[in-house]
Swiss-Prot record:
Residues 1014-1030 have a biased composition (Basic and acidic residues). This is Integrator complex subunit 4 homolog. Residues 426-473, 767-796, 993-1057 are annotated as: Disordered. Residues 1000-1013 have a biased composition (Acidic residues).
Amino acid sequence: MNKKSHQQQVLQQQQQQQQQQFQQQHFQQQQQQQQFQQQQQQQQQLQQQQLQQQQQQQIQQQQQIQQQQQQQQQQQQQIQQQQQPQQIQQPQQQLPNFSVPIINQSIISNIKLYSTFETLLLSLSSTDTREQTKAIIYLSSLTINNKSNGIDLVYCIQKQLVVEAHNHIKVLLINLLGDISLDPFIDSFHILNKLLYLIRNEKSKKVLSSCLININKISKSLTFSKGNDVNSSSSSLINQIIEYIEPLLHSTSPLVRRETIVLLGSIVKNLDKESEEIQILLLNYLKDTDFRVREASLKSLSVIFQRGASLSVNKLYQSIILLLLDSFEQVRLECIKLIWIFGNIYPNHIVVSGGTKIRLVDDVFKKICNAVNDSSVIVRNCACKLLGCTYDVSLNYLIQTLSKEVMVWGKGKQYQIGHSSITKQRLQQKQQQQQQQQQQQQQQPPQQQPSQQPNQQPNQQQTNVSGTHIATPEGDFDVVGSDSLNILESGVIGAFIQGLEDEFYEVRSSAIDSMCELSVRNDEFAQKNIDFLVDIFNDEIESVRINSINSLRKIGNNVVIKEEQLHIILANLESSSKEERQSLHRLLTSIHLSNYSCLHATTQALLMNLSRYPYDIHSIFETLKIIGQTNPFTEFIVDDLLRIDPKFASVEPNMDDIFYVAVMVLVLNSCIKNRNILSLLPSFSFQHHLYFKDKYPKYFPQNLQKDSNIILAPTLKYSSVVNNNNNKNNNNNTTTTSIINDNGEINQFLNLTLSLLYGDNNNIINNNNTNNNNNNNNNNNNNNNNNNNNNNDENDENLNYGFQRLFLNQKKEIQLNKLFQECKRNFKRISSICLSLKPTSDFYNKYLKILTTIVSSSRRFKTITTSNQLNHLLYKLNHKFIGVDNNCKLILMEIGIYSFIIEILSTITLSTSSPPTTTTTTSSTSLFTSINSTPIELSNDQINQLTKKLNEYFKFSNDFKLEISTSIKSLLDLFNIKNNNINNNNNIINKKDKKLKENEENEENEENENNENENEKENGKNKEKEKNENDNENENENERPSKIQKTTSELIKTTTTTSTSTSTLIHYNLIEWTDNYIPPILKISNLIKKKSVDVILPIPNDKPIEFLDIFPLKLMINAKIENIRNLDSLFIQSTWQSIHTGQLNSQIHIIPKSAFTPTKPLSYNISCSIYLSLQNIRHNRLSSKESIPLRISIVEQFLNNNNNNNVTIIPLSKFVIFNILPVDNVNLLPNLI
C-alpha cells in the first residue's frame, strides 16, 4: 500500500509539473500572440495613416481641380457675355476638360517617393524582387551627401551580393556599385577589389560580363588608364586585374570574351612594351567564331592607338582587310574605321595588293570605295564619310571615283572602256595598214594565189577579226585576252556616283560632304565634281539639295561654271523652300560667271524670283550687290537692264519700283570697279542714287565719283527755308552745295545743318549788344541814303537767324515748323550715311524733338502731357548716350527744371479748377490762371523740390566751372540761391557795366526808332516795318531779365497792399518765366556713343509655338549689346495685348550674369532662357486656332529722381515677335501617353 501510494504521489507530482509547464507554455504563446497582434495593429495604423494622407491629398487635388473648373467656367461666361453684343455666331463644341495633369496613383502608392535612405537600404534585403529592383533604381538616381552614407550603401550592397540567389538582382547591384564608384565619397579601389573577387568565385555569364563592364568603367576614371606613367600601387593593381581576367579569355560565353578583350585594351599599363603582345593576342581573336568578339578586338586595337601606341602595319593589315568580307555589318564597320587609321597614319607605307606594290593610303582608299557598295546602310554611310577624310590619295584614283570607266595599265599607256580615249590618228593608222595588205595581195601573180589560199584564209580571217570594229565600237578598246594589262579593282570606279545614287538620303548627303572636302584640296578633282553636284540639285530630299548647294558654294572660287550648269542652278530658284532659295543666292555670289550672257541670265532669274517671292528682297539685293562688285561684264548689259535706246530719250522710271531698284543695285555696285559705266547712265540715275543710298544704305555704295564734275548731292537753300514769303527772289539767294563723300564732308554737312538750326550767328541772343551798336552806327551814317538801306534790308533778309529768332516772332510759326522738318531730314540722312556720326546726329534729333515740344506748348497751352513728353526725351538723352560733355548735361538739367515747373503749374490749375455751374468756355492760349485771378499758393513740397533742383544745377555749374544761363539766373535770384565764392567783385562790376550799356542802348534804340519812322513815311516800304519789328524783338530779348525783375518788383508792391503770401508771388513769377522761356543752344564738342541692343530674330517658322498655359513657357533669347556699362539695369520685357480689353500685359525678366559673354569693351552677347507664366491666355483669342503675338524686347530700368518708388523703363531694342498658340491638354494628350 505504501508503495502504491508513493507511486501515486509521484505520478500526481509529475502530472502537476506537466500541467505547470503546459500552462507556462500556453502563457508564453498568449504573450507572443498579443505582441504579434500589437505589431499588426501598429502596421495597420500606419497603413491607415498613409491611406488617410493619400486621401487628403486626393481631396485637395480634387478641390484644386474644381476651383480650376469654376474659374474656367467663369471666364467662359465672361467671354460669352462679351461676345453676345457682337452677335458672333460660331459653332460651339464642348470638349471634356483635360487640364488636370495625368497622375498614376498606383505608381505613387507603390513607389515611395519620399522614403528615407534607411528604408531604401532595408528594401535591398527584401525577399520581393520587385521591391528590390525599385530600391536599386531609386538609389542609382540619388546623390550621396556624405561619406557615412556611402560606406553604409557599399556595405549593404556587398552583404546582399553574398546572400543573393537571383542573377538579375546581382547584375543590378553590380551596376549600382559601378555607378556609385564615380562619387567622390566612395573608395573606388575597394569596389574594384570586390568586383575582382566576384569574378574569381562567380560562374554566371551575365554576372561576369556585368563585372567586367563596371571594372572597365572604374578603370577609366582612375589615373593609370590615361597614360604611360604608372605608379607602383596602380601597376600592381593592373597586374592583379590581368591575372583575374586572363582565364576569362577562354570562356565559352562570347559576351564574357568580348568584355574581357575590351578591358584588356583599355588597361595596358606600358604601351611601348606590352602593346605588341596585346596586338598579337587581339590578332588571334580576329578569327573568333562569334562576331561580337571580332568587333571587340577591332575596337580594342583602335583604343590602343588612341592611347598613344603604335600599331604594327605588317602584322595586322593583311589580317584586318580579310574582315571586310565579314557577314556581320558591325565587324565590317569597325574594320573600315581601323584601316582608315592605318591609311592616314602611314600613307606612304608600301604594301602588296594583287601582286603589285602600292601605297597604303591608295589601297585603303580602294577598300573604303568597295565598302560604298556594301549591303548595309550604316557601312555605306560611314564609308562615304571616311572617303572625304582620307588625305594624300593619288589623283588617278580620285578621278576614277567619278566615272563608270574601267582603267587599265600596260606598257605605260592608258586606255579606257566606254569613252573615246583612242585618238583618230591610231584608227587611221590601222586602216592604212589594212589597205596596204590588200594591195600586196592583189599585186601577187595568180599562180601563187591558189597555193597560198589555204594559208591565206586564216590570215584573212584574223585580219577581219582584228580589222573590223563590229564587236568594239569606234573609240573603245578590247581588253579581252590582253595579258599585259591589269584592270583596277571595280570598287574605286564610280564610288561617288554609287553614293550619290543611293536610295537612302543619309548616304547621298555623306557622299556630297566627302566630295566637297576632297575638292577643296584638289582643284582638278573639283572641276570634275561640278556636273555631279549640279545634278543633285534635282534630288527629292530638301536637305540633300541644300547640302549640294552649300558644297558647290565652298568650291565655287576654284572652279568655272559653264553656261549649261548655270541654267540648272537658276532653274532651282523657283523652289518653294525659302532656305533652299537663300542657299542658291549665296551660291551665286561665290561662283565666277564666264561671260555677259551668263550675267544677264542670272539677273533675269533673280528678278523672276523677286516677282514670285517678294519676301526674298533682302537676300536678292545682297546677291546682286556682290555680283555687281565681282563681275566685269555689267558694262555690256546696262542698256538692256535699264531699257536705254540711244535713238530715243530715256524715260525716268518710278523710284518705288522694286525691280528698278534691284537693277540699280547691280549697276551702281559695278561702277565701283568699272568707271566707264558712269558715262552710260542717264542723268536721273545720279539723283536716284541719293534717294536709294538713304533708303537702302546696306546695298548701295555711298560714293560713286570722286571727280568734282559730277555733283551727287542736292543743294541746300537755307534762305528759302527761313524766308518763304520771298519766293520770287530765290534765284538771287546764295546757295551752298554739299558733296558727301567722306567723313570730313559729312562733318561739314552737320555743321551746316546746325547753322541752319541755330542761325548763322549762334550767339544772336547773347551778343545783341555788339549787333545793336553796329546797327546804330549804320543807321546814323545812312539816314539820308535810302538805296543803301534797301540793300541792307535785302542782305538782312538773306541772313539765317535760327529757331530762336523765329520762336520770338509768333507770325512765323509755319517757317519754324519747316525749319525743324528740314533739320530732322538732314539728321536722319547723316545717321544713315556715317556710322561714326550716327550717335551725334541721333542726339541732335532727340534734342530737336524737345525743341518742337517746347515750341508747340508755348504756342498753345502747357499741360502735364508736355512735361511727361519732355521727361521721357530727357531720360533717353541722359541714359541712352555715353560720353556727353558737361555743357550738354547742364542744358539738359535746365530743360528738366522747365519741365518740372510746367508739371507744378499744371497740377495747381487742375486742383483749383472747380466744376462749372453754367456753360463756360476755356481759352485755348493757356491753361494757367492769369495774374488778375484769385491768388494761388504753392505747397511747401513743391517749393522744396524746385529749390533742390536749382541747387543741383547750381552745384553742377560750380563744380565744373560752367556758365549759368540768364533764364536760370532769374530763378536763382527769385529763390535767393547764391554762391559767395564765385560771385566776386569782378562779377558785380561787370553787372554795373552791363546796366550802363543797357541804358545807353535803350536811348540809342529810341533815336533809331524815330529815324526809321521818318524813312517809312518817305519811302512807304513794308520791308522796313518787318525789320523794325525784328529789331524790337532783339531788344526785348536783351531786356527780358530786367523785365522779369520789374514784374517781380511790381508784384512785390502789389502784394504788400493785398497782403498775399510769398508762395503766390512765386507762382506768378513762374508763370511769367515759362511764358518768356527760350530753349538754349546745344552743341556737342566730342564724339559720343549710343547704346544699342539687337535681339536676334528666331528661326523663321510658319508654325506657332504650342504650349500649355497652366505651365510656364520657356523661350530662348539671343541678343547683341554695345556701349552698355551697367549690366544690372538690363531686363527682358515681354508684352502681349488683350483682344477683349485692349490692354497691354507685360512681364519683366531678370537677365543672369552668366548670360553675358564679352566680345569687346562694353559689348556683350546675351544668351539666356526666360520662363513666362501665361495662365488663362488662351481666352485672349477669338478662335482656338488663332495665335497670339508675343513681343520680346530688352529694356533698361532707372529709378525716378522725383520719387524713388517709381521706375522708368527705356526700351533699347526693337521688339521681336514670337507667335504662340495656347492649346488644351486634349491636343497634347497623345504626346504625354
